[in-house]
Amino acid sequence: MSTPPSSLIFTVSRLNKTVRELLEGEMGQIWLTGEISNFSQPASGHWYFTLKDDRAQVRCAMFRNTNRRTTFAPRNGQQVLVRASLTLYEPRGDYQLIAESMQPAGDGLLQQQFEQLKQQLSDEGLFSQQFKQPLPSPARRVGVITSASGAALHDILQVLQRRDPSLPVVIYPTAVQGQEAPAQILRALEAANRRAECDVLIVGRGGGSLEDLASFNDERVARAIFASRLPVVSAVGHETDVTIADFVADLRAPTPSAAAELVSRNQLELLRQLQSQQQRLEMAMDYFLAQRQQRYSRLQHRLQQQHPQLRLARQHTALMTLRRRLDDGVQGQLRQAQRRHDYVRQRMVQQAPAARINRAQQRLQALRYQLSQGISLRVNRQNNAFVALCSRLEGMSPLKTLARGFSVTTDSHGAVVKQTRQLSAGDRLTTRLRDGWVESQVTEITRQPARRPRRSQD
C-alpha cells in the first residue's frame, strides 16, 4: 500500500478547522425552525439549548449581547424560528448554531401576538364593563354570523328549535378560517348592523387550534364587534378556548350551544311560570272573594240586628221579664204574709183567748183586704204602664208609618234621603214601602225655592 503525499494527510485539528471554514463559508446564515429542549441560562447570561424535530437535533448557543433583544422568554417544548450561523467547535469536533435572533413559531407566535393584542385593546378600554350592552329579554330575532356548513350553526339552530321554535333566526354566512375569514366576518357584522333586522347577534364557530381560531383574534374583527350597535354574544370553540372576540363581545358563551341558550327563552319554563302565576292569581281571587263574603255577612248581621221588628221583640222580651219579676214579687209578698198569718194564728191558738182571737181575726181580715187591694192597685198600675209603653213603641215604629202610606228612601250607601241636595242625577235609590222595596234611578231633581217673608204694607 502506497503512502499519500503529506500534503493530503489531515490532522484532526486541521480537519476540524477545514470543516469549520467550509461550514461558515458555504452555509452562511440560515433560518431554522424546531422545538427547544435542554434550555439553560448560566450566570454568564448566555443561552444554551438544543433545537430538535422528530428525527434529529442540533446544539445552539445565543450570546448575552444578542439574546437581550429577544422579546419573549424561551422555554422547553416551545416551537421557535431561529436565524443562526453554522459553525464547528474545533476542540471536540461538534458543530453547532450561533443564534442571531429568535422568535416564536407556529402556536407560539400566535400566542405572542394574541397576548400583545389583548394588552393593547385592554389598555384602550375595549374590555371595560361600562361598554357592555345588555341582551334583549326576550329577543325578537337572532342573527348568527358563522359558517353555513359548520357544526356550530347546526348546534345553535338545534338548541333554538328546542327552546323557542317561534324565534326567527337570520344567518349571515361567512368563512371562519383562512386568510379571507376576517374580512368576511367584518362584512357580516357591518351588514347585520346596517340592516338592523335582529336585536342580538351570535358570532362564533366550533373548536380548533390557536391557528384555526386566528380569525377571532384579528384586530379588525375585535374592533368591529366592539363598535356593533347590536349586542354581540361570542361563541368561539369549546369552553377552554379563549379569543380576543370573547373579551370585546357584550357576553361570552363557552360554546355555540350555550350562546343559543343565552339568547332564547325556554318555552317550557315560561309555561311553568304562567301556570304558577295563574295559580297565585286564582288563590288571590279566592281570598279576595272570601274577604268580601265575610264582610257582606257581617254587614247583613248588623243590619238584621238593627231591624225595627227585632228591636220591638227585644223590648217586648224586656217588658215580659219585668212583668214576670213583678208577679214573682207580689207572690213572694203574699207567701210572706201567709207565713206571718199562720205564725200569728198559731200563737193565738196557743194562747186561746177568744176576744183576742176575734180582734186578731178582724184585724187580719182588714190587713188581707188592704193587702189585696194594694196588690191589685199596683198590678193595675204596672199593667197600664206596660200597655202605654207598648202603644208608644208601636206608634214610633217605622213599619206603622209605612202602613199609613208613607215610604222611606235611601241612597246607594244606605243613608236616608231627607233633602234634594243629597242627590245627583244618575244616583241609585231604594224606596221601602209597606209591602216591599222599589229600586229607582234619579233622572231629574227639582228643588223647591225657599219662601220669602211677606213685606208688611204701610
Swiss-Prot record:
It catalyses: Exonucleolytic cleavage in either 5'- to 3'- or 3'- to 5'-direction to yield nucleoside 5'-phosphates. The keyword Phosphoprotein does not apply. GO terms for molecular function: exodeoxyribonuclease VII activity; nucleic acid binding. Keywords: Cytoplasm, Exonuclease, Hydrolase, Nuclease. The keyword Nucleus does not apply. Transmembrane segments: none annotated. InterPro entries: Exonuc_VII_L, Exonuc_VII_lsu_C, OB-fold_nuc-bd_dom. It is found in: Cytoplasm. It holds the Pfam family tRNA_anti_2. GO terms for cellular component: cytoplasm; exodeoxyribonuclease VII complex. One of its GO terms (biological process) is DNA catabolic process. Its EC number is 3.1.11.6. Heterooligomer composed of large and small subunits. Belongs to the XseA family. Bidirectionally degrades single-stranded DNA into large acid-insoluble oligonucleotides, which are then degraded further into small acid-soluble oligonucleotides. This is Exodeoxyribonuclease 7 large subunit. It comes from Sodalis glossinidius (strain morsitans). The lineage of its organism: Bacteria, Pseudomonadati, Pseudomonadota, Gammaproteobacteria, Enterobacterales.
